[in-house]
Amino acid sequence: MNHPFLIAHQQSPAHDRAWRIGLGVVFLWFLIGGIAHFAATRLEMRIVPPYIPWPHATVLLTGVFELLGAAGLLYRPTRRAAGVGLFALTLAVTPANVYMLQRADLFPIPYWLLVARLPLQIALLALIGWSAVRRGG
């Protein structure tokens, strides 16, 4: 049966389970992150580098993109496009992560966690590429 919410390619059960977990992690990452853009807008605005204009609009717009991308992951015909969009969005927000690391004194977050965010972002990009783009639909 070719159902839009099922995976596009049949793999071994272990591989399929890993793929579903990976896709679930990406979905939850962007769902929670997108909600945070609206629930904690002022906090999110603090991480927008000063050279990026309109921090309030930037936070709200990226929150919308995160939520749309997360929703798009759930439906196979839109999964690949959502994955490409989330991949691009993750690259686009990299300056905020770098800014937080450069200005660690402004944020009540342990420095090691700010350092860890950059390799975690690389891992997130790989996970998006594997779970949503390559096997997307």
Question: Predicted regions span which residues?
Answer:
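Membrane-interface extramembranous regions
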Residues: M1-G137
